[in-house]
Amino acid sequence: MKGKLIVFEGGEGSGKTTQLQRSRQWLESSGWLARLQQTLPTLAKPLLVTREPGGTALGIKLRQLLLNSDPEDVIQSRTELLLFAADRAQHVATRLQPHLEAGGLILCDRFTDSTVAYQGYGRGLSLALIDQLNQIATDGLTSDLTLWLDLDVEMGLERSRQRLQQSGGGLDRIERGEIAFHQRVQQGFRALSQAAPERIVTIDASQPEAMVADKIQRILEEKLWQWYPQVSML
């Protein structure tokens, strides 16, 4: 049986990475992973937690170029798109597909919808071109479930600033984009969620972190019982 790909999407400061980690912790503490492991004896670890960009050794280098390059070395929009596509092609071929073929479960921080939202709606590149590149990079792979953490753009950017003040870090190249860019990205995610409601579930990320986590866990539990009915026999 092929595994399942769950993707966490959202704009800057939406909390998607935090919620992905909370979901991982819930899968472990609830016993889901232990039960799933019993049904997949040949798979060393039933859960793969990864991200884009940066889910492979090559991807880590590409992530550095994409997010932390010299501000004076302006990356053109098409260059940015192709770098993200290269990261994804390597990621899918070397990590995602092998794990899915073995029946495993994947939690991924960003995937193809981010490219549509950021490079398509945000940068204004051709959506048809992006679709072609995504098809090439993924070899047709799509998420089984995408959780879009929907949050007001200004609220999200303020969250990012507060987080960075606490950590002593700085905004990355994408976060430094003008607010109009981030608003277009948000419009892109909204359009995607409306076009594919059977795949993309919208989560109100303005709620307290614990409430958001609880809603996501309920969604995941329902999906997991559907996807892995053999676990209920244990």
Curated annotation (Swiss-Prot):
Pfam family, one: Thymidylate_kin
EC numbers on record: 2.7.4.9
Catalytic reaction(s) noted: dTMP + ATP = dTDP + ADP
Claim: Transferase is one of the keywords in the record: yes
InterPro entries recorded: P-loop_NTPase (IPR027417), Thymidylate_kin-like_dom (IPR039430), Thymidylate_kin_CS (IPR018095), Thymidylate_kinase (IPR018094)
Binding site residues for ATP: G10, G11, E12, G13, S14, G15, K16, T17
GO cellular component: cytosol
Keyword Nucleotide-binding: yes
A biological process from GO: dUDP biosynthetic process
Molecular function terms from GO: ATP binding; dTMP kinase activity
Keywords of the record: ATP-binding, Kinase, Nucleotide biosynthesis, Nucleotide-binding, Transferase
Family assignment from sequence similarity: Belongs to the thymidylate kinase family.
Function: Phosphorylation of dTMP to form dTDP in both de novo and salvage pathways of dTTP synthesis.
HAMAP family: Thymidylate_kinase
Protein name according to UniProt: Thymidylate kinase
Origin species: Cyanothece sp. (strain PCC 7425 / ATCC 29141)
